[in-house]
Structures are given as structure tokens and as C-alpha cells.
Amino acid sequence: MFPMMTGFMNYGQQTVRAARYIGQSFMITLSHANRLPVTIQYPYEKSITSERFRGRIHFEFDKCIACEVCVRVCPIDLPVVDWRLETDIRKKRLLNYSIDFGICIFCGNCVEYCPTNCLSMTEEYELSIYDRHELNYNQIALGRLPMSVIGDYTIRTIMNSTQIKITTDKPLDSITITND
């Protein structure tokens, strides 16, 4: 009879322990129930990028000196820099600059090592297209700013606050800027 009594006590202890574990897991489940969802409904909500996000590369043609540092530091030799040596001034003249974002690994080495800061990383991450050849951006496509920068509230208020008007009583070379 004594072994039977210890068997019931062990069964009772195991039942209490199992009920405690079930209760603890149920409390954890209830604590997660009142949290906000962390998923983002992508096409309708855009994710907020971090400050040092490495998105599409922005290129300023006028600043580039065709030194080809970006090509040398790129792990896959991706930027294509076409230039011509001007013999009269003995300097390189940039003809064409292009990057294929289908191959780019967005490491940021070209931006970091550029001596004239003509390259910068934007916050643009939506580069999906149907034809992979459209991911080859030339200097014109690389020079476009992303829509998030153009549609910025501060830029819109600056553009709306100053209007350029040409007055007829002054010479045509003078422009009057008024705040409305």
C-alpha cells in the first residue's frame, strides 16, 4: 500500500507541475496579445530606412574628375567610367558613367572612397523591374534624386514660399523675389 501512496503523490505533483507550465505559457500568450503588430503592409506603408541605409547610388556628373577610384575599390569592378584625356589642359574629361544595379552588392565602398564626394547613397530601395537591362543606370538616371527627397515637406514649403516675378518697369535682367 505504501508504494501505491507514493505513486499517487508523484502523480499529483506532476499534475500540479504540468498545470503550472500550462498557466505560465498561457500568461505569456496573453502578454503578447495586447502588443501592436510589427508587420508592415508593404505596398501601402513604406518602411522607414535607417540613417546610414545603403540604397541606390546618386551620382553628380559635374563633381566627378574621372579618377576611377570607385572602380578600383569596388569588389566586382562594377562602375563603368568612360573618359578622354584633354591634351590641351592635360586633364581627364568624363564622357560616360554607369552602374548596373542588377550586379551591384550595395557595399558602399565607391561612396566612401570617392575623393570629390560625387557619389552618395540614397534611401531608395524600390528597384524592382521586369527587364534586368533597365537596372543599368547611366549618369542621367544616377543623377535623379529619389521621390522621397523631391516630395519632402521642407523643400515644398521653400518652393512655395518664394515666387519669381519679372516686373516690366525694370530691365529684363532684374528679377524680384517676393514672399506671399
UniProtKB/Swiss-Prot annotation:
GO MF term list: 4 iron, 4 sulfur cluster binding; iron ion binding; NADH dehydrogenase (ubiquinone) activity; quinone binding
Positions that bind [4Fe-4S] cluster 2: 74, 104, 107, 110
Major subcellular location class: plastid
Gene Ontology biological process terms, A to Z: photosynthesis, light reaction
Topology with respect to the bilayer: Peripheral membrane protein
Keyword Cell membrane: no
Any single GO CC term annotated in Swiss-Prot or TrEMBL for this entry: chloroplast thylakoid membrane
EC number per UniProt: 7.1.1.-
UniProt-annotated binding residues for [4Fe-4S] cluster 1: 64, 67, 70, 114
4Fe-4S ferredoxin-type domain location: 55-84, 95-124
Cofactor: [4Fe-4S] cluster
Assigned keywords, A-Z: 4Fe-4S, Chloroplast, Iron, Iron-sulfur, Membrane, Metal-binding, NAD, NADP, Plastid, Plastoquinone, Quinone, Repeat, Thylakoid, Translocase
Coiled coil regions in record: none
Chain's role: NDH shuttles electrons from NAD(P)H:plastoquinone, via FMN and iron-sulfur (Fe-S) centers, to quinones in the photosynthetic chain and possibly in a chloroplast respiratory chain. The immediate electron acceptor for the enzyme in this species is believed to be plastoquinone. Couples the redox reaction to proton translocation, and thus conserves the redox energy in a proton gradient.
Full protein name: NAD(P)H-quinone oxidoreductase subunit I, chloroplastic
Species whose genome carries this gene: Drimys granadensis
